[in-house]
Each structure stands twice: as structure tokens, then as C-alpha cells.
């Protein structure tokens, strides 16, 4: 219990510090999500130890932070409290049920609104004129920013309409539109000044600027969302109708304020806004739900920090907090070892997340990760989930360091540090490593490889485990009889797979090269190799120096290619595959090595009379001519058409010889 008490006190200090940075200095060091998590964690622990520890001065019982010394302090007419946050349906349901169960009214209405991501402001009007503008501060007194607020055009300086009260206290949010935020950072970049990390910081910094003219130039926007005090005796009891009245007096009000009378209605509004927010020109981080009746609000009252009659239902479907339980190591098809965090299962956007890739060991060091840490996981759209940052270090128990493995977790081979900058570790066993072999088979049969329909990763793994496939060439020895022995594969599916295998036997040289999964050799590099060698035999008998002559191949790829073709294990597989496949050249026309332009780099400039640009490029490639898109010193010729552009000017600077269209056509027509 003593350890927990000490941890609580430490957590209180940490939250106070970050609240001071956020509210007072306007210079937060952690994300809003991380701050919210720390507060929730503190609330949980305080509740657990409520009879043994005093929490009167805890940040869970206070609002905001102290004020900046540059601004004068003024008290609010009524306290300007913050809101309690909920992030999941169950917590919102608890709030809803507590309201409904504690009030003996036939029908309770709630006003659902947007939760703006800006700076809360309290405006005081005397006889319809703006008298003072004060920030939230600690909830009871804030900073006088009247001179700056006077520069914000959307804040009414004089109220319009009828029944204007003698004294009026209005609450709202000052924020920066997304479009204005972009313009501001462009302007700051131009003058080589520090950029704002987000629109909220930009709004807060602009509102608190010592020079009111700067505030005016920053184009801030104001929306009203409530009334703190009104001396008008006949003011309506409905918060929703009060907003309408405030609008008639000249206050800008959001178009997304709705009255709801059920949990389901509010939930539908939440889901709608969750999608709609991406189309808004300002940032929001959730919705706010308030009991509509002012009388009921008063009966429900408040805590020292927040009202009991309102809650902020924040968006958190894309970001969740979970705990790292273990670190696993996956071996890829090229032997790269990828650390994977095994986490406490959570749902994000309807998807159950159990594992999260850490990409490389440098990422572990960057995040300072340990087993037992609580982390923020983000998943946007269909993007693979990733860890944003550590939410909380494991403090109550000893956490384990994550060390770099020395041996392959699959085959036991000694691992090699492939890249010190990103700390990439590789297993050099190649296809002798079962995991690499399976992953290569997945790739070999995939759309990027030979595109064998029906042979997915699960079936391939079963075929390997049953001993039916022990190298790449065994795929082409499969038959219906063997396939039907595999679980969940019937005769029709087997026949379809065999048909697809037979279709894949006719393959281009570049496609074949790409399917082999040679490290750093993708479709573009494979095509360059194919255009240079034309045949598999020439490729298998080439030297490292010859690889370096190919466009787009540097020392690393040349080493990978040379090591691959000189490995006896690989040689044997290539030999077997060449006997079972019909590997055709990507160059369909007959190649004449006496062709002036054979294996020469050319670039086109201008338009051509006899062929379209795409057609003339296609013909050139068929003749073994290397076509590039831009001019560089390595280009051998520039082919000049009508109205050539800047490429010709650049080519002349490099003294690149030019060939006009007619002459070029005479050269290639001989071979067509």
C-alpha cells in the first residue's frame, strides 16, 4: 500500500506539472491523450485508496492551472469549471444512467454539442457592450485578455436585438480554423520562425500575445456555447433555447447543437460527428452532452472541478491505451528480424488488436519501451496499428528491458546487424531457415510473384508442414490428389489451384526474378536486370562489376545479386525452376547487338509525328534501348521531336548528342 501511495503522490506532481505547462505556459510536452490517461489513472488509484490517503489538493479536484504573470487576474461571476471526460460507450452509459436514475422527471432532454479544440473564454457584457474577456484559468479566476479579444472579429463588441440584459456572462471557445492555421505556418516558414505544432497551441499563443495587433493578424474565431450568468429575469430554463437567444443577440453559435431525449439518439449523434469532423474547417475532439434544463442542472450541482450534469464524450476510436505483455520476433522472407509487441487485446475501429509491429530496434530505443509499459496505439483507416508513445512506464513492478537477439528465433543461426542506423538484424541462413522459406513461398505465389490463385499463406504453410513442398520448384509438382489431402481443400478448389499453377508456368524474365524475393530486388530493379541481360543464363553467369553497370543498381544490390547467384542452394533451385517454367524475355523483338542504340540510355523531348510518346517508348524498350525520363550526365542520346522543351537545353549543357525523329526512326525501323 505504501508503494501505491508514493506512486499516487508522484503522479499528482506529474499532472500538476503538465497542467502548468498546458494551461499557464501554453507549452505542453505531452499529448492530450497522454494527459487524459494520467488523470484517469490517478482517479482510479485515488478511488482505490480513498480511505487511506487524503486527496484534497489533488489535481483531480482542481481546474486548469495558475495564470501567466503578464496578465491581470479577474474572477468569474460564476465558476468556469472543466468537464469530466469519457472515452468509451460503457462510461457514457454510466453517466447517462446516473442522471436518469437521480431525477424524477418524466422526460429528460439533453443538449448535444461539439467539443471545440481551442481555448475556453469567458465574456462579460455590461448593458450590451463587451466589458471584459477572461480565460478559464483555475476555474474561479483567469487572465484578462480583453484587448486581444477585441481584435477577434467574430466576438461581438456590442449586442443587437431586444431584451438585452444589464449583465451577461457568456462562455465560448476561441480557436483557429484549419485553413488559417495552414496560412499562419506558411507565413512563419517564410520568415524562418518557429512553427506551431497544432491549431490549439496557435490559438492559445495568439490569444495571449503581448501585442494585440498580432492577435488580429492571426485570424482567430469564436463560437459561443453557453451562459454563465444573466441578469435578465425571464431568461428561458432551456440551455438549448438560451443558445438560440444568444444567437439573436449576435453571438456566433455552432450549427451542430441538438436536443436529444434518449441514449440511442445521443449515440447516433456521436457516431455522425465522429465521421463529419473530417469535413469541418476546425478541430474538435469529441462532443459535449449537457442536461438541457437549467433547474435540473442546479439540482444536480457540481464537484469542485466539474459539473455533474455534463460530460465530454471524447473521440478515441483511433487511439487506445494498452499494455505491452511481451516482445516476439518475426523473421521476414529476406531474413530481417522484426520486433513485434504482444499487447493486451483491444478493439480499435472495430478491429481486435493483439500484436503491433515495432518495425526495427531503433523504434524500441526511440520510444524507450519496456515490457509492462502502457502505450498509446493508433490505427487510422486501414493503416497497420502502430505505437505512438509510452503512456505510462511500468513503475509498480520491475519492468523488463528489451534486448536485441543474437540468434534467429526460428532456425538458431547467428544474426547479423545489417544497418546500424536503423538497427536492422538479419538471419543470413536464407531458404535454409524455415520461416524465411515459408515467407518466400507466400511471396512467390502472391500477386507480386507468379500470382497463383488459391495458394494463400495458410494453405502454403500446411503444404510445407505436411512435407509436400520443400523448395520452390515443388509447387509445380502438386496435383489434385495431394491437395485434397490438405484440410479444407476439396476437389473443385484443388482443380482451380492446379489450373492456376499451370497458367503461371509461362512467365516473363523480370516477373520470375521479382518472385525469387532477392533482398532489395523489387519489380523495377528486376525489369532493369531483365532489360540488360535478356536471359536467365546470362544473369546467372554475370559478375558483380556487370551488375553495377545496370541503371538503378548500387553496391548493396550488386552484392545481394552476386551472393544470390553464387549460393549453391540457390543455384540448385533456379536450375529446377528453369526446367519446369517457360521463362520468356521481356524484350519481344529480335535483338541485334550491332544496333547503335542497343543498351544505350535515351531521353525523349518534344512530340513525334509517326508515333505517340507511349508507343515510341514501348518500341525502344523492345529493342533493348534504355529509356529514362530525365536528363543527366549518364544519358547517351536525346531524341528530338517537334517543339522540344527544357530537356534539350539541359542536354546541350551536358554535351549530350541529339538524334532527330527521322534519323531515330531510320535506326529502329531496320529492326522492326
Swiss-Prot record:
Annotated residues for binding of NAD(+): 32-36, 82-83, 113, 136, 173, 290, 314
EC supergroup of this enzyme: ligase
Transmembrane intervals: none
InterPro entries attached to this UniProt entry: BRCT_dom (IPR001357), BRCT_dom_sf (IPR036420), DisA/LigA_HHH (IPR041663), DNA_ligase (IPR001679), DNA_ligase_AS (IPR018239), DNA_ligase_CS (IPR033136), DNAligase_adenylation (IPR013839), DNAligase_N (IPR013840)
Pfam families recorded: BRCT, DNA_ligase_aden, DNA_ligase_OB, HHH_2, HHH_5, Nlig-Ia
Catalytically driven reaction(s): NAD(+) + (deoxyribonucleotide)n-3'-hydroxyl + 5'-phospho-(deoxyribonucleotide)m = (deoxyribonucleotide)n+m + AMP + beta-nicotinamide D-nucleotide
Active site feature: 115
Annotated positions binding Zn(2+): 408, 411, 427, 433
GO biological process: DNA repair; DNA replication
Cofactor(s) needed: Mg(2+); Mn(2+)
Family indicated by similarity: Belongs to the NAD-dependent DNA ligase family. LigA subfamily.
Record protein name field: DNA ligase
Organism: Buchnera aphidicola subsp. Baizongia pistaciae (strain Bp)
Amino acid at each position: 500500500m505504501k508503494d501505491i501511495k508514493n506512486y499516487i503522490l508522484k503522479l499528482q506532481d506529474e499532472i500538476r506539472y503538465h497542467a502548468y505547462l498546458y494551461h499557464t505556459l501554453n507549452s505542453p510536452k505531452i499529448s492530450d491523450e497522454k494527459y487524459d490517461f494520467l488523470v484517469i489513472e490517478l482517479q482510479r488509484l485515488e478511488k482505490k485508496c480513498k480511505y487511506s490517503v487524503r486527496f484534497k489538493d489533488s489535481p483531480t479536484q482542481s481546474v486548469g492551472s495558475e495564470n501567466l504573470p503578464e496578465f491581470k487576474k479577474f474572477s468569474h461571476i460564476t465558476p468556469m469549471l472543466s468537464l469530466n471526460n469519457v472515452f468509451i460507450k460503457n462510461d457514457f452509459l454510466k453517466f447517462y444512467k446516473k442522471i436518469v436514475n437521480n431525477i424524477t422527471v418524466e422526460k429528460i432532454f439533453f443538449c448535444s454539442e461539439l467539443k471545440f479544440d481551442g481555448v475556453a473564454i469567458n465574456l462579460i457584457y455590461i448593458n450590451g457592450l463587451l466589458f471584459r474577456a477572461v480565460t478559464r484559468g483555475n476555474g474561479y479566476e483567469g487572465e484578462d485578455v480583453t484587448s486581444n479579444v477585441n481584435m477577434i472579429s467574430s466576438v461581438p463588441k456590442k449586442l443587437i436585438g431586444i431584451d438585452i440584459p444589464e449583465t451577461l456572462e457568456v462562455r465560448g471557445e476561441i480557436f483557429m480554423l484549419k485553413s488559417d492555421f495552414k496560412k499562419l505556418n506558411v507565413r512563419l516558414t517564410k520568415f524562418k520562425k518557429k512553427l506551431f505544432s497544432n491549431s490549439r497551441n496557435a490559438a492559445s499563443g495568439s490569444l495571449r500575445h503581448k501585442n494585440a495587433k498580432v492577435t488580429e493578424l492571426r485570424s482567430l474565431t469564436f463560437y459561443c456555447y453557453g451562459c454563465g450568468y444573466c441578469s435578465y429575469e425571464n431568461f428561458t430554463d432551456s440551455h438549448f433555447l438560451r443558445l438560440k437567444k444568444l444567437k439573436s443577440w449576435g453571438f456566433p453559435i455552432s450549427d451542430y447543437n441538438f436536443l436529444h431525449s434518449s441514449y440511442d439518439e445521443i449515440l447516433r449523434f456521436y457516431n455522425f460527428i465522429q465521421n463529419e469532423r473530417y469535413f469541418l474547417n476546425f478541430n474538435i475532439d469529441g462532443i459535449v452532452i449537457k442536461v438541457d434544463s437549467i433547474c435540473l442542472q442546479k439540482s444536480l450541482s457540481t464537484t469542485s472541478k466539474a459539473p455533474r450534469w455534463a460530460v465530454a464524450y471524447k473521440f478515441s476510436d483511433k487511439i487506445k491505451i494498452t499494455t505491452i505483455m511481451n516482445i516476439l520476433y518475426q523473421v521476414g522472407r529476406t531474413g530481417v528480424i522484426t520486433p513485434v509487441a504482444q499487447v493486451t487485446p483491444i478493439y480499435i475501429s472495430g478491429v481486435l488488436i493483439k500484436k503491433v509491429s515495432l518495425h526495427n530496434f531503433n523504434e524500441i530505443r526511440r520510444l524507450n519501451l519496456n515490457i509492462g509499459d502502457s502505450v498509446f496505439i493508433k490505427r487510422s483507416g486501414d493503416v497497420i496499428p502502430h505505437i505512438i508513445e509510452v503512456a505510462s512506464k511500468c513503475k509498480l513492478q520491475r519492468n523488463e528491458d528489451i534486448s536485441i537477439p543474437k540468434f534467429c528465433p526460428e532456425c538458431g543461426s547467428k544474426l547479423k546487424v545489417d544497418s546500424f542506423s536503423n538497427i536492422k538484424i538479419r538471419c543470413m541462413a536464407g531458404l535454409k531457415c524455415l520461416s524465411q522459406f515459408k515467407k518466400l513461398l507466400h511471396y512467390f505465389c502472391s500477386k507480386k510473384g507468379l500470382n497463383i490463385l488459391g495458394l494463400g499463406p495458410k494453405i502454403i504453410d500446411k503444404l510445407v508442414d505436411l512435407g509436400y513442398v520443400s523448395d520452390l520448384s515443388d509447387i509445380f509438382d502438386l496435383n489434385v490428389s495431394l491437395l485434397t489431402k490438405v484440410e479444407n481443400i476439396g476437389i473443385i478448389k484443388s482443380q482451380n489451384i492446379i489450373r492456376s499453377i499451370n497458367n503461371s508456368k509461362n512467365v516473363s524474365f523480370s516477373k520470375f526474378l521479382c518472385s525469387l524475393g532477392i533482398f532489395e530486388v523489387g519489380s523495377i530493379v528486376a525489369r532493369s536486370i531483365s532489360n540488360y541481360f535478356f536471359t536467365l543464363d546470362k544473369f546467372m553467369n554475370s559478375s558483380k562489376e556487370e551488375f553495377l553497370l545496370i541503371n538503378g543498381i548500387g553496391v548493396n544490390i550488386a552484392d545481394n545479386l552476386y551472393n544470390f547467384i553464387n549460393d549453391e542452394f540457390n543455384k540448385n533451385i533456379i536450375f529446377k525452376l528453369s526446367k519446369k517454367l517457360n521463362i520468356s524475355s521481356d524484350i519481344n523483338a529480335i535483338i541485334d547487338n550491332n544496333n547503335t542504340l542497343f543498351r544505350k540510355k535515351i531521353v525523349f523531348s518534344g512530340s513525334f509525328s509517326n508515333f505517340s510518346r507511349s508507343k515510341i517508348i514501348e518500341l525502344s524498350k523492345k529493342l533493348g534501348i534504355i529509356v529514362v525520363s530525365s536528363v543527366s550526365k549518364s544519358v547517351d542520346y536525346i531524341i528530338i521531336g517537334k517543339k522540344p522543351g527544357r530537356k534539350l537545353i539541359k542536354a546541350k549543357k551536358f554535351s549530350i548528342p541529339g538524334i532527330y525523329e527521322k534519323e531515330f526512326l531510320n535506326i529502329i525501323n531496320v529492326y522492326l
